[in-house]
Amino acid sequence: MKKILSLSLVATAMLLNASETANLEKISVVEIANSVEVTDVSEEQIKSADLADALSKNVPSISIVRRSGIANDIILRGQKKDNINILIDDAKIYGGCPNRMDPATSHVLSNNVQNVKVIEGPYDVENFGTLSGLVKVETKEPTKDVHGEVNLNAGSFGYKKASATTSGGTDKFKLLISASTEESDQYKDGNGDTFYEQQVKKGMKAVPNTMNPMMPATNATYINPNQKAYEKKTVLTKGQYNITDDSEIKASYTANRSDNVLYPTGTMDADYDDSNIYTLGYTVRNLGKLSKELDLDYYYSNVDHPMSTKLRNSGATSYMTAQYKTSMNGQKIKDSFEVANSLVTVGLDTSVRNWKGESFTTNVATGAVTGRTVSLASTDTTNKAAFSKVEKSFGKLDLEVGARYDYTDVDSSDTKKMDRNYDGLNANIFGVYNVDEKMKYFAGVGKSSRVPDARELYSTGMGAQGNSNLEDTKNYEADIGFDKTIGTFKIKPKLFYSELKDYIYNTGTTFQNIDAKIYGLDISGLYALDDHFSFDYGMAYQRGKKDGNYTDKDLAEIPPLKANLALNYEIEKSKYTAEVVAVDRWNEYDSSAKEQELAGYALFNLKYTNQLHKNIGLTLGVDNVFDKVYNSTNTYQDITYASIGSQRVLFNDPGRYGYVNLKYSF
């Protein structure tokens, strides 16, 4: 696999020198063959605002990391955090919390999302840090014609939501405005227990002080047993101005405001999460032989995330706050043009991320703040990169070859910390052989990398301490599969093997580089039984192993076998869906990283939609119909959980959840 770079260069030369006539429109070989697209998210995934929940239901290779009633995280083929890249309208946003309370997926709500495209593997050269996968979130686009909709949603556990969207414009200018507000009480598990009741049952009235065992145990339960689980408000605005038929300017702003988000598995909750995403883009087409399409893009994002113990009994008289802030800005210029019957894309990509954090104590009676300490010194991660991509068709064979060179500086404001710089050349080759319209084979090999983040290098706060000697992680991966249609039956199996060098792993006290491998397969498809009935199916299985002499050789956060099955019945203006999400027993886990065995489970969900009137739509649904008690998420030590003795507290997922959504559109 280490010959990927030279193979990529040879393949590029072959493509540019080939004389066979090709289709010079954008082939998007990787996106066509090696991606999963979840469409109409705002229309279909209306249960709640949680994008992670929607993705885990629709993409077999994605599993949810549930720690709250909202703002949950995802694992893609055994990878999460910085090992996968998440873009929102081509902008990068990172969470502020080192404990993953506010992952990137939490900074956009499903009611604002049009489509999500998931590209598995290292087949992305346009964006910084795509190690093992790319999740591209596309929000709603403005329209010329005047459109709008209002949604009212209610569900179990006191869930209430209202959202509204309007869009319209002219041939020259289009504008979209969307806003939403929602709140929920604590969900109940299959036993009927709320967050607070689970805390009491699991012994969180007396959590030992792991930092100082000589100190008395703390009461980490909620002061108010009926504390709301969260409140959330969002705004999305988008505008497009068409300068000419071949050029336009686009701008957008996304705001997320979340308050008092409860994380019952830990000892702190989020006081608030405030985030903003700004984007500005200019596109011009047909400038001449050297520019089929030229794109100039800029984005800026920022997050303010304070978490504290003030909602817990441990913080009744004085509470601790850990406040983290992060921001990122990026610029990209990309040009596509034709050379030797090939479509060539070249570009420059730069970005700067800042991350910093501090902790302090507040006296409830007086409001006095004391003990301010820096937990993460202000750190800039500056990336500069050049990339290129060539796409070409040779009859039935479509090829895409890409390469990217990165130079990254990581600079800490703490003069006692060692600044780091990293450079890397990454490349991939991906091909699709189209036997006919109903059968295609695809395969790819690639090398990618990602640098350590500020927490992994320099953190002095809670949990594992930073290690400034970390190297960047390299991924050498191969993927192969086929896509076959037989009448109304479609099947798409894929195999992958990923060799990870200098993989960044949390040892409990610090971070270290290890070598490891992840491999697996997934199968997806559908079967249209007739004009009314259809069956969607998908399954994913992956395993992760450490290389070397370790007490436990299993990698952490490698979910077990998972299957998604759905039977749909459509007639006139109605659609009925019965869905099963089944997960095998989690019996291969890293006990040395504080994971534990989890029982398997199968959930049965029902959903009904009806277009009652041309302007009015109704959706009814029940998730976890049989009120199962289950756990979707393991207790890897990269996240701080409350511990009772040697056992980390394991929280149950939601029990039976019913919901109704009424939509008025015009």
Where are these regions (language model features)?
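Surface-exposed extracellular loop regions of Gram-negative outer-membrane beta-barrel proteins
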Residues: 257-259, 302-306, 361, 366-367, ...
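Flexible loop and strand-edge segments within Gram-negative outer membrane beta-barrel domains
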Residues: 228-232, 246-294, 301-326, 379, ...
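Outer-membrane beta-barrel signature, preferentially recognizing the C-terminal barrel domain
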Residues: 268-290, 323-328, 375-381, 417-420, ...
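Transmembrane beta-barrel wall of Gram-negative outer-membrane proteins
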Residues: 156-183, 194-259, 274-286
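A beta-strand signature from Gram-negative outer-membrane beta-barrel systems
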Residues: 107-149, 665
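C-terminal beta-signal and adjacent terminal beta-strands/loops
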Residues: 190-191, 501, 587, 610-666
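Short acidic/polar hinge/loop motifs at secondary-structure boundaries
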Residues: 64, 92-120
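Gram-negative outer-membrane beta-barrel transporters
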Residues: 392-399, 408, 490, 495-499, ...
